[in-house]
């Protein structure tokens, strides 16, 4: 049987930045091939394992890739550290141990590539297209880091570009123009003052947020600019559709918009509904439950009618940071909680 903590230590030594997951996928495939209970299938740098069983069919999903960063592995007493320790090699290792446990449930496990980059390259989506029936499951758990709590659903996310108009002039005579950067400051202030909704959905509280994440404006060092572009990211609760979220964003920004300004939604995806139905045993084993603040592939699974939660080892606040560390006890605890639920 695979031991998750030892495997996580080995996985941390295998670089797997997005689009470079072949080596880690090969490694996991080789480790799992010796288990006679598993039926393995490989597509590109994505791996699927099937374990037949009874009861509801369950999918466990975890991505193999990491963001770029310093490739340094370290161990300090009861923690493991390194690029991807939290997001999400600890979860990937936990999946591997669960795959070799004696369980009662009908189980599908998916290790997939390119989650950290554009959705068009996401390995879970590519697998769903290449393997019809893969998502014909009753329940799913995405092993994103959750600090050992079960996180229900996920937020939707929307990215919009706002272009504000001004009037160009010489910077020695700024009163002859209208500075689009000054207008942008007013818009950013409006963005920062959005009162976040906090709806209770599925018994847990979601907190929305709106942030300015990028700004551009420049003509020359002696010119008052006549346009400014601000990109906003709206994280909305899963009771809103992307269309409803876009309408709410536009309504909020309207007081600082003028004729000629434009708001363009460049990307928007729905969240996943918060539901505990079917996951009660996992929540009991984990000991805590809350809302998922952020978007995960639980949202993608929801578009295919699959109820999904997030549950994995590691503090999500450390994801993508130089100090990613995960407690060994948390990895083991994740395995035991999943195994307890899946064996029931």
Language model features with spans:
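Acidic/His- and Gly-rich active-site-bordering loop/insert found
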Residues: 1-85
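Hydrophobic anchor at the start of a short beta-strand
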Residues: 39-40, 47, 58, 107, ...
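Fold-independent oxyanion-binding glycine-rich loops
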Residues: 43-45, 62-64, 113-114, 139, ...
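Active-site metal-coordination/substrate-binding segment of hydrolases
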Residues: 57-111, 119, 123
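Acidic-glycine-rich active-site phosphate/pyrophosphate-binding loop
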Residues: 64-76, 137, 152-163, 309
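Acidic/histidine-rich catalytic neighborhood of metal-dependent amide-processing enzymes
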Residues: 93-159, 202
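Metal-dependent amide/peptide-bond hydrolase catalytic core
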Residues: 145-146, 152-153, 159-344
């Amino acid at each position: 049987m695979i031991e998750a903590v030892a495997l996580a230590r080995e996985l941390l030594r295998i670089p797997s930045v997005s689009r470079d997951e072949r080596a880690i996928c090969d490694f996991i495939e080789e480790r799992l091939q010796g288990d006679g209970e598993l039926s393995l299938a490989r597509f590109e740098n994505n791996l699927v394992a099937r374990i037949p069983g009874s009861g509801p069919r369950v999918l466990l999903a975890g991505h193999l890739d990491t963001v770029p960063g310093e490739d340094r592995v370290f161990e300090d007493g009861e923690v493991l550290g390194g690029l991807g320790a939290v997001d999400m090699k600890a979860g990937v290792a936990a999946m591997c141990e669960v795959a070799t446990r004696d369980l009662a449930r009908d189980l599908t496990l998916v290790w997939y590539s390119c989650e950290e980059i554009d959705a068009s390259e996401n390995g879970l989506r590519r697998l769903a297209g290449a393997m019809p029936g893969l998502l014909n499951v009753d329940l799913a758990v995405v092993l994103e880091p959750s600090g050992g709590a079960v996180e229900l659903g996920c937020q939707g996310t929307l990215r919009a570009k706002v272009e504000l108009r001004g009037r160009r002039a010489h910077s020695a005579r700024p009163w002859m123009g209208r500075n689009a950067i000054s207008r942008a400051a007013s818009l950013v202030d409006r963005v920062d003052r959005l009162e976040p909704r906090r709806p209770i959905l599925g018994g847990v509280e979601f907190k929305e947020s709106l942030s300015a994440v990028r700004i551009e404006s420049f003509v020359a060092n002696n010119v008052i600019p006549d346009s400014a572009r601000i990109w906003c990211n709206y994280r909305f609760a899963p009771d809103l559709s992307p269309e409803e979220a876009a309408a709410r964003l536009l309504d909020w920004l309207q007081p600082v918009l003028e004729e000629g300004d434009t708001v363009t939604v460049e990307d928007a995806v729905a969240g996943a509904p918060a539901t505990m139905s079917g996951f009660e045993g996992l929540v009991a084993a984990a000991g805590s439950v809350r809302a998922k603040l952020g978007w995960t592939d639980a949202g993608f699974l929801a578009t295919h009618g699959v109820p999904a939660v997030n549950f994995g080892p590691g503090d999500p606040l450390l994801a993508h940071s130089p100090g990613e560390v995960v407690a060994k006890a948390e990895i083991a605890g994740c395995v035991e909680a999943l195994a307890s639920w899946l064996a029931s």
